[in-house]
Amino acid sequence: GVASPGIIDSKNGKILHACNLPFDHYPICERLGGLLGYRNIRVENDANAAAWGEAIAGAARGTQNSIIVTLGTGVGGGFVIDNKIYSGFNFAGGELGHMVIQVGGRLCGCGRRGCWEAYSSATALINMTNEKILMCRNYGKPTRLTDCLDPEGHVSGRTAFDAMKLGDEEARDVVNEYVMYLANGIASIINIFQPEVLSIGGGISGEGGALLELVEPLVRRQQYGPGLVPLTRLCIAEL
């Protein structure tokens, strides 16, 4: 089995389009079958595969309706509705990262502006952190952000969170802005679909409870009907 970002035609084994990969109508199952000598190869959208895994054996097990939001290079979305993966009639459903949250906003990798992915992916967080470091240098402000780079000396998705834990206020500003956009998107998803569980996966979810403690209060503040109906359980993905 293969899990890939993008619009996936799982019936015909093709990657129809992936904005962060050079694939358009790529017959990945056929190509891999030829290379590996296997006939029974299946491809699915990576977030859909993650959603199904969580529904079967992870944070959403025992439920019939759940959603996963994956935070990595982009923002992915996987839906399990009535115990079935939902991908739309054209396999393009669930592309949560490309819902617009800011009209005319930041440029997204898909070529459009204002997509949620441009604000809530790990890539977006890295960009925001780099911008903050540059601003601090230009204005002579002290910051611990540069003490929290990865082993290669680059900003990562952990940099701002690690510096915030050291008490750095500039890092806290970055994290708070990032979390605001993330919570806005999650609240909108919950208001539309009202799943039993919404789990957060991908690289940024490695922050675990620290991330959830920041996101959940903002989500609850914007959730429609809190206190009047059962609430969607918000959690970190387990798998």
Where are the regions a protein language model picked out?
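A glycine-rich, Thr/Ser-enriched phosphate-binding loop motif common to dinucleotide/cofactor-binding enzymes
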Residues: 43-53
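ATP-binding/phosphotransfer module of carbohydrate and carboxylate kinases, centering on a glycine-rich
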Residues: 1, 9-12, 30-40, 53-64, ...
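Structural signature of FAD isoalloxazine-binding scaffolds in flavoprotein oxidoreductases
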Residues: 92-95
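Generic structural signal for well-ordered beta-strand positions
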Residues: 16, 86-87
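Short glycine-enriched, charge-decorated loop/helix-capping segments at active-site entrances
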Residues: 15-21
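Conserved A3 ("GATE") glycine/threonine-rich loop of ANL adenylate-forming enzymes
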Residues: 49, 73-76, 103
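Short beta-strand segments
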Residues: 1-5, 44, 68-74, 78-80
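Short catalytic helix/loop segments, enriched in acidic residues and glycine
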Residues: 24-25
